[in-house]
């Protein structure tokens, strides 16, 4: 394990790199120094901004040959193509929902099995404690 000698004074989370601590501190300050030039939305990390900018992509070059639906990304088309397979269904054993891919079912199953972290200020719940902490900063 790496030596985690950089500790946050707000929550005591430790990091092996000073740069990671500095990036982490933005969670506590609420600062979002990386802004989208398309819509103005702010992000704590440049990486998050880059991921967001892809949502503004206008061309949809990937076309389903079965129904004509278009996608910005090849993985979106590939996922969609599974919905055209006959008799390929993945039912949830906990409720009545049916999914066209095992990946979608697996994501859904987390709602039945994972521990949740409720916000004490509103009715939102989160699957990860870190997401609850981030959310609580808005209250």
Swiss-Prot record:
It is found in: Nucleus. It comes from the Eukaryota. Pfam families: zf-C2H2. The keyword Transport does not apply. Its main location: nucleus. A zinc finger (C2H2-type) spans 6-28, 34-56, 62-84, 90-112, 117-139. GO terms for molecular function: DNA binding; zinc ion binding. Keywords: DNA-binding, Metal-binding, Nucleus, Repeat, Transcription, Transcription regulation, Zinc, Zinc-finger. GO terms for cellular component: nucleus. The keyword Zinc applies. Belongs to the krueppel C2H2-type zinc-finger protein family. May be involved in transcriptional regulation. This is Gastrula zinc finger protein XlCGF29.1. It comes from Xenopus laevis (African clawed frog). The lineage of its organism: Eukaryota, Metazoa, Chordata, Craniata, Vertebrata.
């Amino acid at each position: 394990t790496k030596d985690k000698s950089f500790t946050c004074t707000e929550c005591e989370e430790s990091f092996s790199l000073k740069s990671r601590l500095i990036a982490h501190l933005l969670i506590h300050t609420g600062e979002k120094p990386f802004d989208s030039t398309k819509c103005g939305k702010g992000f704590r990390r440049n990486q998050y901004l880059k991921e967001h900018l892809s949502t503004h992509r206008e061309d949809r070059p990937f076309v389903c040959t079965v129904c004509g639906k278009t996608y910005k990304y090849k993985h979106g088309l590939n996922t969609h193509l599974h919905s055209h397979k006959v008799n390929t269904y993945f039912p949830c054993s906990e409720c009545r929902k049916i999914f066209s891919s095992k990946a979608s079912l697996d994501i859904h199953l987390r709602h039945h099995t994972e521990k949740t972290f409720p916000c004490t200020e509103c009715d939102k719940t989160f699957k990860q404690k870190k997401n609850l902490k981030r959310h609580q900063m808005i209250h």
